[in-house]
């Protein structure tokens, strides 16, 4: 019989798979799918961003830009996913970033 962690480990993940592992939910889940995971090396995650995102109404009207802090949060969620992926039982842990240094946002 497979353990929960073995059942969770696969090549690709859709949003239903991701929310089984990460605690985030709509509207703050900022990963839509994961196309590839190489433990200890990288994870390839996708967030589908459309003009319909609510933050585009005010950031910036007529010139929409995804807020940098949301890009950073997406990276944090992807990192947490990779860290949890490498655990034997990912459902018993949560990952949090306690700080970020030297980050700059610009165009």
Predicted features by range, described:
Residues 60-77, 81-90:
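Helix-adjacent hinge/juxtasegments
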